[in-house]
Amino acid sequence: MRFKGLDLNLLVALDALMTERNLTAAARKIHLSQPAMSAAVARLRTYFGDELFTMRGRELVPTPRAEGLAAPIREALLHIQLSIISRDAFDPAESSRRFRIILSDFMTIVFFRRIIDRVAREAPAVRFELLPFSDEHDELLRRGEVDFLVFPELFMSSAHPKATLFEETLVCVGCRTNKQLSRQLTVEKYMSMGHVAAKFGRALRPNIEEWFLLEHGLKRRIEVVVQGFGMIPPVLVDTVRIGTMPLRLAKHFEKQMLLKIVEPPLPLPSFTEAVQWPAAKNTDPASIWMRRIILQEAANMASAHEAARHRRHC
């Protein structure tokens, strides 16, 4: 099919080339032979009057013109997919849909297992691909390459819809044999102790307590940096180091390890966990179904947490 002289099938080829950055892989993705894909590249170059890609080894390197075309083409194809091709009613019990979700190890351990267990009962053929924090998460959302982000709301952009899940607080943790934690933790002690700190993504973004400390002109003595909160407790065992992590995750590890939970000596801010999805998938029936489950399970967990907190204070 042509539109103003452009074979629209070429847009599918260009999208695959931008995603895969390899001629053979792109051809395989859209079920073309390699010669057919090479011909598509030649036609794209003629139509747009640009080289579009140069070769670096076996990798295709897009030109600025190709980079500029990538986002609108991806969004147009995604819109067609969701509004025309996939408008049939979504039946969870019969679906084999795969949901790609970026989330932290914290949310995987304390929350998302609930989602997986419930979906296994209601939609046994539905699959999940859980992905680690990415520095490009907003771009992945925009391209429709992930279905959801699940992490602190403050890291989310305003470009896509989102919903809050629950509030979380930060606590300090250390080995139960650490004698420095036998008395109330002071600011001076906290700052002088060796810390295990979680940072995220390839750029090692600082986490919430790090931002708080930097804003107040405070700098900890970080001895170990780990990728994710879940790696903090194992590194603390049999040491005099300290870590800072979400309360729910600390309680999870407290049951399994010699972990001691103490109040931070500083008023570390709480944070809001949220879920975000691509704007293009806002009316997608499968996305709506999954969002409903995520929000319901978040409400159930928040209610159980509040009830437990009330019992402790009675």
UniProtKB/Swiss-Prot annotation:
Organism, scientific name: Bradyrhizobium sp. (strain NC92)
The HTH lysR-type domain sits at: 6-63
Q: Anything further noted?
A: There are at least two nodD genes in B.sp strain NC92.
Claim: Transcription is one of the keywords in the record: yes
Concerning its family, UniProt says: Belongs to the LysR transcriptional regulatory family.
UniProt keyword annotation of Calcium present: no
Protein's name according to its UniProt entry: Nodulation protein D 1
Q: Name the Gene Ontology molecular function terms of this record.
A: DNA binding; DNA-binding transcription factor activity
Instruction: Quote the DNA-binding region ranges, renumbered to this chain.
Output: 23-42
Q: What does this protein do?
A: NodD regulates the expression of the nodABCFE genes which encode other nodulation proteins. NodD is also a negative regulator of its own expression. Binds flavonoids as inducers.
- The gene from which this protein is expressed is nodD1
What keywords are assigned to this protein? Activator, DNA-binding, Nodulation, Repressor, Transcription, Transcription regulation
Q: Which Pfam families match?
A: HTH_1, LysR_substrate
- The disulfide bonds in this chain are none
Spell out the Gene3D superfamilies in the cross-references. Answer: Periplasmic binding protein-like II, Winged helix-like DNA-binding domain superfamily/Winged helix DNA-binding domain
